[in-house]
């Protein structure tokens, strides 16, 4: 492997397209900083150097090959931020398998769809999260697993492509491999075969698949490449001036790009230590930053609010903090100022992007004036073209004029898995990726988000897609038709609201709708507000005017926009941080 061509130490420097696989990036960092911390779980007493982490990844990769996992197979991981998660991210990359990230909020309905549509062959999972038993959910979808005499070779009627299920721990579960068993198999993989597999990889191979929805239909599997996420992670870290001396506190979910690209790959590219929390808890974040002397911290606005409002906040020494990223939803200036002044994050940055962009298009610089870091989402990362264009085409509009935000470059996805029509709608023949967001770019290239073309709702950093919830609610007895919109909320940015036309004699209300949804779809998708109506506002051609419903929602439920922000994230389950979009990343 040749030495990388890196930019000079100050600023972005000249762009060089460094096309490496993720395995090559890790190997290079392990060779440069073998004895520095790579992965730390402070609450577990778990700590690996780069040499140790690279060795663990090699053993796991060989074990996966011994299981029979082939290049191009999907390997789903349904887990919180456990230590095995990041090892699996690089082990799959080393053998050319595609890591399929699964949201831990998913229930049976969503898991069945994602594993089925992706034609996933392998699943790694933990046992449970809060009141949700992952193993029992899987057994209910694939009951054949419960009666298998041994692990491997699954034949499931509902998931016909799934062959192997692995438990991310030492415990044995019916029909599943354990992690010690997989590591023990590593000696069965011949060195020549292992090296040949790595040599067969192309940096433009798909290596990561994440499911994201649009306003028209169910989630789509976004295929991302080694080069796309690897180089994106490099420049995200570069904008923060990461070096091997930095230590990033990472409390955001790894199943979103915010965790596995902005976090993990930024650190691996620069040799910075990853101080990971399994789930978000504001007290645990403050403890980890102080104990590990973290220099950077990530989070969505509600997470930073919860940390600042924690009753013991003033007791913690956060003087080591320098930089980080706030993303996931709108980042208000008063909050940014508190983070800068009270948490010492004077070089905090803001990102913008979407999963299809690997995920970051633009990011502010640590030296940008604070007003620019509050009012804009920064400038395009090196190697990525960003323009504001006419929504009906791809022609660039004059600076200062609002239009749709597009990007083109190494970061654009390969496409949606087995959805060529959707891919063609998202990416123009010239290679421009449509964001669906509206923005304005100034003369200096700083981008400001002004709205969304899409109807997507962002609740506390989690992307919520109305069409998916509408199709689900149409299965509820008594519901004739339904429209889902975002309701303004000071606490979460937006809440989910549903307008329902009932069947004759039925009278669904908020409680009955929530009861119907509970346990079947992710909690953040369940409507908080419900209104029964006789009809929806229509255009002359019969199309539903959703913008009028959004206005009606704001009038019906004004109290939602007046909820206090203090401690907002603390009252919700641990994974409120989410899939950044809008003023966000991935």
Short names for language-model regions:
Residues 18, 27, 35-82, 86-90, ...:
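Conserved AMP-binding/adenylate-forming core of the ANL superfamily
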Residues 19, 34-37, 158-162, 166-173, ...:
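Conserved pre-ATP/AMP-binding loop-to-beta segment of ANL
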Residues 67, 95-184, 504-506:
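Structural core segment of the AMP-binding/adenylate-forming
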Residues 106-116, 123-127, 297, 409, ...:
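AMP-binding/adenylate-forming catalytic core of the ANL superfamily
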Residues 163, 521-543, 562-567:
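AMP-binding/adenylate-forming catalytic domain of the ANL superfamily
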Residues 168, 182-187, 269, 291-299, ...:
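Gly/Ser/Thr-rich phosphate-binding loop
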Residues 230-247, 254-296, 310-312:
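Conserved AMP-binding/adenylation subdomain of ANL enzymes
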Residues 379-383, 393-426, 462-464, 557:
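Conserved ATP/PPi-binding loop(s) of AMP-dependent carboxylate-activating enzymes
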């Amino acid at each position: 492997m040749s030495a990388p061509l890196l930019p000079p130490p100050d600023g972005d420097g000249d762009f060089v397209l460094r096309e490496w696989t993720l395995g090559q990036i890790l190997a290079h960092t392990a060779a440069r900083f073998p004895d520095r911390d790579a992965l730390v779980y402070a609450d577990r007493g778990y700590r690996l150097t780069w040499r140790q982490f690279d060795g663990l990844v090699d053993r796991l990769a060989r074990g996966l090959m011994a299981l029979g996992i082939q290049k191009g197979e999907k390997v789903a991981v349904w887990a919180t931020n456990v230590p095995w998660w990041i090892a699996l991210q690089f082990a799959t990359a080393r053998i050319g398998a595609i890591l399929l990230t699964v949201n831990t909020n998913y229930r049976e309905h969503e898991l069945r769809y994602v594993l089925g549509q992706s034609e996933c062959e392998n699943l790694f999972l933990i046992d449970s999260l809060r009141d949700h038993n992952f193993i029992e959910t899987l057994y209910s979808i694939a009951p054949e697993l419960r009666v298998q005499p041994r692990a491997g070779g699954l034949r499931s009627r509902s998931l016909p492509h799934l062959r192997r299920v692995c438990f991310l721990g030492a415990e044995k579960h019916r029909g599943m491999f354990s992690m010690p068993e997989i590591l023990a198999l590593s000696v069965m993989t011949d060195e020549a075969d292992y090296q040949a597999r790595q040599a067969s990889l192309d940096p433009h191979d798909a290596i990561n698949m994440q499911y994201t929805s649009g306003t028209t239909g169910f989630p789509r599997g976004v295929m991302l490449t080694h080069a796309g996420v690897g180089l994106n992670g490099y420049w995200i870290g570069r904008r923060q001036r990461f070096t091997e001396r930095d230590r990033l506190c990472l409390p955001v979910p790894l199943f979103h790009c915010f965790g596995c690209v902005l976090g993990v790959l930024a650190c691996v590219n620069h040799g910075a230590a990853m101080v990971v929390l399994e789930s978000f808890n504001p007290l645990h974040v403050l403890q980890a930053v102080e104990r590990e002397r973290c220099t950077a911290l990530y989070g969505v606005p509600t997470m930073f609010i919860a940390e600042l409002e924690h009753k013991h906040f003033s007791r913690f020494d956060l003087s080591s903090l320098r930089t980080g990223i706030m993303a996931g939803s709108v980042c208000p200036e008063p909050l940014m100022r508190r983070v800068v002044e009270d948490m010492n994050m004077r070089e905090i940055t803001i990102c913008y992007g979407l999963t299809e962009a690997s995920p970051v298009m633009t990011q502010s610089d640590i030296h940008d004036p604070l007003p620019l870091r509050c009012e804009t989402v920064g400038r395009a990362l090196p190697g990525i073209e960003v323009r504001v264009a006419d929504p009906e085409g791809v022609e660039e509009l004059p600076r200062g004029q609002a239009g749709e935000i597009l990007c083109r470059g190494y970061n654009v996805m390969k496409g949606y898995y087995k959805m060529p029509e959707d891919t063609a709608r998202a990416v123009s023949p010239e290679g421009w990726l449509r964001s669906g967001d509206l923005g304005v770019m100034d003369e200096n290239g700083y981008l400001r988000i002004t709205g969304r073309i899409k109807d997507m709702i962002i609740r506390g950093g989690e992307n919520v897609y109305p069409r998916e919830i509408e199709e689900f609610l149409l299965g509820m007895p008594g519901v004739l038709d339904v429209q889902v919109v975002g309701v303004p909320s000071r606490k979460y940015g937006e809440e989910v609201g549903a307008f329902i036309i009932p069947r004759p004699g039925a009278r669904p209300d908020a409680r009955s709708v929530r009861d119907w949804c509970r346990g079947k779809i992710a909690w953040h998708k369940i409507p908080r507000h419900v209104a029964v109506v006789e009809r929806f506002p229509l255009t002359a051609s019969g199309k539903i005017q959703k913008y009028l419903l959004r206005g009606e929602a704001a009038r019906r439920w004004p109290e939602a926009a007046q909820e206090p922000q203090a401690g907002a994230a603390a009252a919700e389950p641990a994974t409120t941080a989410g899939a950044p979009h809008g003023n966000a990343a991935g």
